[in-house]
Amino acid sequence: MTRRLFGTDGIRGTANTDPMTAEMALKVAMATAAQFRRGSHRHVVVIAKDTRLSGYMLEPALTAGFVSMGMDVVLVGPLPTPAVAMLTRSLRADLGVMVSASHNPFHDNGIKLFGPDGYKLSDEMEAAIEARIAADGAAGGPAADLAGPRDLGRASRLEDAPGRYIEQVKASFPRGLRLDGLKIVVDCANGAAYRVAPKVLWELGAEVVPLAVGPDGFNINRDCGATAPAAMRAAVLEHKAHLGLALDGDADRLILADESGTQIDGDQIMALIGRSWAEDGRLKGGGVVATVMSNLGLELFLRDRGLTLVRTPVGDRYVVEHMREYGFNVGGEQSGHIVLSDFATTGDGLLAALQVLAEIQRTGRPASEVLRVFQPLPQLLRNVRFDPAGGVRPLEAAGVQAAIRAGEARLGGRGRVLIRKSGTEPLIRVMAEGEDEGLVASVVADIVAAVEAATVPRAAGEAATVTQVQPAE
C-alpha cells in the first residue's frame, strides 16, 4: 500500500486547504479510530496541539471524528509533541494525536499520530489508514463503523497535563544535580513549549531568560526558535548567559548556543551525549543512530572511539525505528531532533537540553568547551523550492544527474553529495561536504543550478527560491 497523505512526519499542508481541512481531519480521525478499535473496552485518544490559529479548527474536527466512532478524547491543549507520546503511554490510551506543523510557518499545520506504545505509526499503518479514508462511504470505510447513540465517546480536558510532562522531563535529570548558578536563555518559538520549558529550567534552579513565549496564533516560528536562532544567540550575549536553547514550534528539536553565542547543532549534541553515555557504560547498541544528513566529522569522531554511526533516511521516525530494532538508545538528526530512548519514544528538545546541562554542571566547564566535541567537515546545504503540482521531477532530470556525478567526481573520496526531496515541504535539498570548503561550495552551486534549470517556478515569472540553510564551518 502506498501513502499519499502521509509524509515523513504525518500529514502536513496549508491550513484550510486540502489536505489540511476540517473535513479531512474528521476523516483521518474516523479512519484511525476504525483501524485501532479492538474489543469492547472504552477506547481513549489523547489530543494536543501547538499554538497555530488553525489548531482551533483541527482539534474539534478530530475530536468529533473520534467521538463519533465511540472513542473518548482527552484534550491537553498546547503541549510539546513528546508530551503527547508520554501521556499516551501513561494514560494507557489507544492513540495519541499532535496537531502541529513543527518548524513550519503558522499558515501550515499537520497531524501526527502515535500508537499506544508512544511511538509514531509505521508506514504500513499509515497506508492502512489512508486506504480507509479512500474507501469513505464504501465497505471498509470508517462511516461503516460509526458508534450507536449510546456508544458515542466523550471529550474531557486533562488540566494537569503540563505538570505531568514537566515532572517526566525533570526525572531524566540526575538526582543530586541542580542548575543553580546557570543563566539560561530559552527560545520557545511562540510554540507548544512556551509554558513548560521555562518552568522546567526554573524548577531545577536556573535563572531563566525566556524568549518567544507570547503566542498569538500567527507568530509561531516567526524569526525565532530552532530554525531561526539568531535572537536566541543575541540574547545569550546580551544577558551574559551560560547557554541558550532554541526549540521549534512543537519542541521536538533543539539548537543550542554556547556562552559566546556560537550555534551548536544536533550532531554535536549527539556526539556529547554518545561519548558521555559510553564512558558511563550507559550507551546501548555500540554507537549512535543518525541520518544521511549528519556531518562526516561525527562519524569519524565516533569511529576513533570504537563507536559506530548508523545512518538512516531523513526523518526522526526512521531513526527511532532503527534504534528500536537494533537496541540503540541515542539517536537523532543534525537539525536538532534528539532521541534518547531511555527516557522518551520520540525526539524531545527539552529533555536533550537537560542532558547537556547535566554535563556542564558535572564538569564545571563552560558550554563552549563541553559542546565543541568534534571538528565538523565543511558542509553546505541549500534548498530549491519548486511547484509539485507542475508534474516536474527534478531529481530524475538528466542534467541534475550529470551534475551530481560531476560533483562526486570532483570531491573524490574526500567528501560526499546528497540530494533529496523534502518530506514536509516543496523543496529539493542539495547538500555536499568535504575537506575543501571552496570546492564544496562550488559543487553545491553547480547542482543547485542544474536543479533550478529542471524546476518549474511556483508562480509565473518567479525564479525558484534557493535558501542557504547551513553554511560550511
Curated annotation (Swiss-Prot):
Enzyme nomenclature, EC number: 5.4.2.10
Post-translational modification Phosphoserine, affected residues: S102
GO process terms (BP): carbohydrate metabolic process; peptidoglycan biosynthetic process; UDP-N-acetylglucosamine biosynthetic process
Single GO MF annotation: phosphomannomutase activity
The keyword Isomerase belongs to this UniProt entry's keyword annotation: yes
Uppermost EC category: isomerase
GO CC annotations, alphabetized: cytosol
Function description: Catalyzes the conversion of glucosamine-6-phosphate to glucosamine-1-phosphate.
Protein name per its UniProtKB record: Phosphoglucosamine mutase
